[in-house]
């Protein structure tokens, strides 16, 4: 979670990476997220019909892999 401040600050650049990881997310979804971690978890959960803990896990993996 320490990286999240950096992710939030670079969200415009990282939206593409997020879209690669979650291809079902729309540009509107990603704009709505606007770098907010909880919002991303919610959108991933909603789009993919996941349990909150699974969505959290995926966002954590994204956080680890984004090289921020």
UniProtKB/Swiss-Prot annotation:
It holds the Pfam family CsbD. Coiled coil: none annotated. Gene3D superfamilies: YjbJ (1.10.1470.10). InterPro entries: CsbD (IPR008462), UPF0337_stress_rsp (IPR050423), YjbJ (IPR026042), YjbJ_sf (IPR036629). Belongs to the UPF0337 (CsbD) family. PANTHER family: UPF0337 PROTEIN YJBJ. This is UPF0337 protein RB10934. It comes from Rhodopirellula baltica (strain DSM 10527 / NCIMB 13988 / SH1).
């Amino acid at each position: 979670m320490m990286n999240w401040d950096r992710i939030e600050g670079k969200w415009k650049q990282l939206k593409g990476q997020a879209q690669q990881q979650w291809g079902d997310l729309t540009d509107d979804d990603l704009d709505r997220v606007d770098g907010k971690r909880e919002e991303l978890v919610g959108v991933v959960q909603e789009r993919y019909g996941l349990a909150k803990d699974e969505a959290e896990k995926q966002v954590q993996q994204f956080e680890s892999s984004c090289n921020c």
